[in-house]
Amino acid sequence: MYPVHLLVLLAVCVSLLGASNIPPQPLNLYQFGNMIQCANHGRRPTQHYTDYGCYCGKGGSGTPVDELDRCCKTHDDCYTEAGKKGCYPKLTLYSWKCTGKAPTCNSKTGCKRTVCDCDATAAKCFAKAPYNNKNYNIDTKKRCQ
């Protein structure tokens, strides 16, 4: 083998080792976003739910500010329970379809079904709950104690 080939091979190996330290990205959040759009018939962009109240978005604490925020807390709790069963909700891809303008899970068993049910239930809850613009991008340090 030529020295240049060895250098290229070494560079690839080092790159792969570095990539193994990159944390995995939440893959199923794209699916969840599509479920939300299915349930609310595209009336509200998915990103409006990423920084709403005390529980919609990353993390969560305190008392939910309204019905929509309670949907997010319930979804967080569902993911926690799925994690206790050995599932990785943010990384679990599942099969579903939009029927009658509501998400329906096709995955039958295990983590795929559990996570799909968490997401479908939350998406339907979001569609029913009123959206209060005052609860978007709130000061969580003050309002979520």
Swiss-Prot record:
UniProt keyword ATP-binding present: no
GO CC, any one term: extracellular region
Compartment annotation: Secreted
Cofactors required: Ca(2+)
Keyword Repeat: no
Matches recorded under SMART domains: PA2c
Keyword annotations from UniProtKB, A to Z: Calcium, Disulfide bond, Hemostasis impairing toxin, Hydrolase, Lipid degradation, Lipid metabolism, Metal-binding, Platelet aggregation inhibiting toxin, Secreted, Signal, Toxin
Catalytic reactions of this protein: a 1,2-diacyl-sn-glycero-3-phosphocholine + H2O = a 1-acyl-sn-glycero-3-phosphocholine + a fatty acid + H(+)
The organism's place on the tree of life at top rank: Eukaryota
GO function terms (MF aspect): calcium ion binding; calcium-dependent phospholipase A2 activity; phospholipid binding; toxin activity
Signal peptide residues on this chain, from the entry's feature table: 1-19
Cofactor, free-text remark: Binds 1 Ca(2+) ion.
Cysteine pairs bridged by disulfides in the record: C38-C98, C54-C144, C56-C72, C71-C125, C78-C118, C87-C111, C105-C116
Tissue: Expressed by the venom gland.
Gene3D superfamilies per the UniProt record, alphabetical: Phospholipase A2 domain
Binding site for Ca(2+): Y55, G57, G59, D76
Entry EC no(s): 3.1.1.4
Catalytic class of the enzyme: hydrolase
Gene Ontology terms describing biological process: arachidonate secretion; lipid catabolic process; phospholipid metabolic process
Active site: H75, D119
Family of the protein in this entry: Belongs to the phospholipase A2 family. Group I subfamily. D49 sub-subfamily.
Function field: Snake venom phospholipase A2 (PLA2) that inhibits collagen-induced platelet aggregation. PLA2 catalyzes the calcium-dependent hydrolysis of the 2-acyl groups in 3-sn-phosphoglycerides.
Protein name according to UniProt: Basic phospholipase A2 S11-61
Organism in which the protein naturally occurs: Austrelaps superbus
